[in-house]
């Protein structure tokens, strides 16, 4: 760049700094411009690895969607527990009025320090979220769910009144306000969303998410969570096998997936994941029904191996450390890249 243009650029940058504050425009190579992405764990080791950065990124909008009872709220409660364990403050905006405090406590959530709001309208919920973000004192906010963010006009209207596009407009306006503040305060905002079926779709997926298209664009990470099977003990169903696809990721390569077990009353079983991922990486040996680690048998069947690791936390920590090291060396081995899924919406 010639000297005259360089001076003109310096003058412009100086004027921008004066008017909008220092750091309004930066060179990407500047030391302060590039920050390591801070994350909160999802509670699933496999999903943390599939996300590419070790968890859900702070300073971003994340959308978690899926059918009913697929584990959406469980995933967010694990993230809240992770945030609180790191000394952070978390808030849960319960638009569905369905949070189970007992279950949250079992997942490691500190209920005494969890901020909770049960708003009457969608506008109130999103305004509360915006105020918490702008405070800069809250590290993680969960909004459960987009489908329950009912516009005030709809609540005050009569049954059967048409309110086409109201919720989509509400979400679009709120996200325009929220995103800049979220980035500035480094707050992680998670929206839980439900799935609906589009009528008259002949080709492609008929599934779509509620609340219009704004959230699809503003979300840095979108997770599609599905129940893929039941976990049985004798004849009793004690949990679900769950698969999560990373359908959008602006902080790492997308389209990876992870599978894990969710046990009723217990949440995501990290120990079951250690056994499965350990076998995948040849860290845990499997011979028939027996699992072994470094030549020592740790259990016959996954349940017994899981129980053994529960009783020997130092061994579990060692296996986890080796899995993380192996995943760093083989980024696609832990969760195979899948074909790009049909776009939802």
Curated annotation (Swiss-Prot):
<dbReference type="GO" id="GO:0006281">
    <property type="term" value="P:DNA repair"/>
</dbReference>
<dbReference type="GO" id="GO:0009432">
    <property type="term" value="P:SOS response"/>
</dbReference>
<dbReference type="InterPro" id="IPR049261">
    <property type="entry name" value="RecA-like_C"/>
</dbReference>
<comment type="function">
    <text>Can catalyze the hydrolysis of ATP in the presence of single-stranded DNA, the ATP-dependent uptake of single-stranded DNA by duplex DNA, and the ATP-dependent hybridization of homologous single-stranded DNAs. It interacts with LexA causing its activation and leading to its autocatalytic cleavage.</text>
</comment>
<keyword id="KW-0227">DNA damage</keyword>
<dbReference type="GO" id="GO:0140664">
    <property type="term" value="F:ATP-dependent DNA damage sensor activity"/>
</dbReference>
<dbReference type="InterPro" id="IPR027417">
    <property type="entry name" value="P-loop_NTPase"/>
</dbReference>
<comment type="similarity">
    <text>Belongs to the RecA family.</text>
</comment>
<dbReference type="Pfam" id="PF21096">
    <property type="entry name" value="RecA_C"/>
</dbReference>
<dbReference type="InterPro" id="IPR023400">
    <property type="entry name" value="RecA_C_sf"/>
</dbReference>
<keyword id="KW-0233">DNA recombination</keyword>
<keyword id="KW-0234">DNA repair</keyword>
<dbReference type="GO" id="GO:0003697">
    <property type="term" value="F:single-stranded DNA binding"/>
</dbReference>
<dbReference type="GO" id="GO:0006310">
    <property type="term" value="P:DNA recombination"/>
</dbReference>
<dbReference type="InterPro" id="IPR020587">
    <property type="entry name" value="RecA_monomer-monomer_interface"/>
</dbReference>
<dbReference type="InterPro" id="IPR003593">
    <property type="entry name" value="AAA+_ATPase"/>
</dbReference>
<dbReference type="InterPro" id="IPR013765">
    <property type="entry name" value="DNA_recomb/repair_RecA"/>
</dbReference>
<dbReference type="GO" id="GO:0016887">
    <property type="term" value="F:ATP hydrolysis activity"/>
</dbReference>
<dbReference type="InterPro" id="IPR049428">
    <property type="entry name" value="RecA-like_N"/>
</dbReference>
<keyword id="KW-0742">SOS response</keyword>
<keyword id="KW-0547">Nucleotide-binding</keyword>
<dbReference type="InterPro" id="IPR020584">
    <property type="entry name" value="DNA_recomb/repair_RecA_CS"/>
</dbReference>
<dbReference type="GO" id="GO:0003684">
    <property type="term" value="F:damaged DNA binding"/>
</dbReference>
<keyword id="KW-0067">ATP-binding</keyword>
<dbReference type="InterPro" id="IPR020588">
    <property type="entry name" value="RecA_ATP-bd"/>
</dbReference>
<dbReference type="GO" id="GO:0005829">
    <property type="term" value="C:cytosol"/>
</dbReference>
<dbReference type="Pfam" id="PF00154">
    <property type="entry name" value="RecA"/>
</dbReference>
<protein>
    <recommendedName>
        <fullName>Protein RecA</fullName>
    </recommendedName>
</protein>
<keyword id="KW-0963">Cytoplasm</keyword>
<feature type="binding site">
    <location>
        <begin position="66"/>
        <end position="73"/>
    </location>
    <ligand>
        <name>ATP</name>
    </ligand>
</feature>
<dbReference type="GO" id="GO:0005524">
    <property type="term" value="F:ATP binding"/>
</dbReference>
<keyword id="KW-0238">DNA-binding</keyword>
């Amino acid at each position: 760049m010639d000297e005259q243009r360089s001076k003109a650029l310096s003058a412009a940058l100086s004027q921008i700094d004066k008017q909008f504050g220092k750091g309004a425009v930066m060179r990407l190579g500047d030391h302060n411009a590039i920050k390591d992405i801070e994350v909160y764990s999802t509670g699933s080791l496999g999903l943390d690895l599939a996300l590419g950065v070790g968890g859900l990124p702070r300073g971003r909008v994340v959308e978690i969607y899926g059918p009913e009872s697929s584990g959406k709220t469980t995933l967010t409660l694990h993230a809240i527990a992770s945030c609180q364990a790191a000394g952070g403050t978390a808030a849960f905006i319960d638009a569905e009025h369905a949070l189970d405090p007992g279950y949250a406590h079992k997942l490691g959530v500190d209920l005494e320090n969890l901020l909770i709001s049960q708003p009457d309208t969608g506008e109130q919920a999103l305004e509360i979220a915006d105020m918490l973000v702008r405070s800069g004192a809250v590290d993680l906010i969960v909004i459960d769910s987009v489908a329950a963010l009912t516009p005030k006009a709809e609540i005050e209207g009569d049954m059967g009144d048409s309110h086409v596009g109201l919720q989509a407009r509400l979400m679009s306006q709120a996200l325009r306000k929220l995103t800049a503040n979220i980035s500035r305060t480094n707050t992680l905002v998670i929206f839980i969303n439900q799935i609906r079926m589009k009528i008259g779709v002949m080709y492609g997926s008929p599934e779509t998410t509620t609340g219009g298209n704004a959230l699809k664009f503003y979300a840095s990470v979108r997770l599609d969570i599905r129940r893929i099977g039941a976990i049985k003990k004798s004849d009793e169903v004690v949990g679900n096998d769950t698969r999560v696809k990373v359908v959008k990721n602006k902080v790492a390569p997308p389209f990876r997936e992870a599978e894990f077990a969710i046990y009723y009353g217990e949440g995501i079983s990290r120990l079951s994941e250690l056994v499965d991922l350990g076998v995948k990486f040849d860290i845990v040996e499997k011979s028939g029904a027996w699992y072994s680690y470094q030549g020592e048998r740790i259990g016959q069947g996954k349940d017994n191996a899981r129980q053994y690791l529960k009783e020997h936390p130092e061994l579990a920590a060692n296996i986890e450390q080796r899995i993380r090291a192996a995943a760093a060396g083989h980024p696609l081995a832990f969760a195979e890249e899948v074909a790009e899924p049909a776009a939802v919406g």
